[in-house]
Amino acid sequence: MATRRGDTLLFPTPPVVAAHAAIGGKKEGEGPLAACFDELSADNFFGQSNWEAAEKEMALRAARLCLKKAETTPDKVSLALAGDLQAQCTASSYALRELGIPFVGLFGACSTMAEALGLGAALCSAGMADGLLAMTSSHFCAAERQFRTPLSYGAVRTPTAQWTATAAGACLLRPAGEGVQLCAATFGRVQDYKIKDINNMGAAMAPAAAATLLRYLKDTGSAPADFDRIYTGDLGHVGGQLLRDLLAAEGLLLKNHVDCGCVLYDAAEQTVKSGGSGPGCCASVLCGHILPRLEKGTQKRVLFIATGALMSQTTFLQKERIPAIAHLVELRSPQQKEENG
């Protein structure tokens, strides 16, 4: 069972990530992490007739591949926790419609993967799930159409803008066994720093990442140097620097910080401005890049902090401010478990 220390859930017997899968589109296949994906498609329609159906297909492929790698079937999965950026999380619900797994829809914008992992770990730790699927996705074209402008409009992107990843990530959690350990989770509080610019999500989300990280460090008595990496997703280059500035003001130097939105693409070559974003960005980097490093023991202990801007197309048109949230999970290498006996 989990124990609570402040705002942080600790899992003395950590649930594990038994399997994971990452799917990406054309632009992701042109980036520096291309080799990390299980599957890449040069066709961003993924064989479908529209962008929204393409995202559903991508999420479905990620889920099926994850289950295949775990050598299990949908009927043996207790629950799926999933979400996306489409209205009412239709990419996730339409994908899960085909799998028949009990489904709880989540919305945390780009923070959804950490939200799903934290909730999933709590359910597994409490004995409520033997196998739990945590997954999320995003699609550049679907997100642009919903939140910004149709692609045919040809709007100029600002330097602070980020590129919504066409990607999906899925993890299968189990209460125990072999795999990367989920040792702790801290769920975020909504932060509002009066940002209204929809093309500067990093500025809106950086304070949320700082607030959640500071609470976790206080609750656990940890310091940034205790971790091989502190991953955020997805603040981009602008938001990442703002996070480091905010923490420096608190006396913390974040020398081991890596943002998923900064490593998925080559900003100099791929015209993504401030970097990647979208739930599928940090989810695919987690499943294709971070978890394999932990499995190999290249990294032993990391924090994964996913951030989300909680606006809608309606609140944006009403000129509301953009609140944000960040959820955190602590991940440890299975090799560290062996070393600790």
State the predicted function of each range.
Residues C89-T90, F140-R145, R189-K194, M311-Q313:
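Short, well-ordered, mixed-charge alpha-helical segments that flank or form enzyme active sites
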Residues F107-A134, C171-L173, S277-T298:
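Active-site-proximal alpha-helical scaffold in enzymes
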Residues A18, A82-G83, L132-S138, V302-T307:
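Short beta-strand segments
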Residues E55-E71, L117-L119, A204-D219, V285-I290:
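Short, well-ordered amphipathic alpha-helical segments that serve as non-catalytic structural scaffolds
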Residues V17, W51-C110, D226-Q241, L246:
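Conserved beta-ketoacyl condensing-enzyme motif
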Residues S93-R145, T149-A161:
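A generic, well-ordered mixed alpha/beta core segment in the N-terminal half of proteins
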Residues E28-E30, A91-S93, A143-R148, Q241-L243, ...:
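Short acidic, glycine/serine/threonine-rich loops at helix termini
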Residues M1-E52, P150-R215, D219-S222, L252, ...:
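Condensing-enzyme catalytic core mediating Claisen C-C bond formation in acyl metabolism
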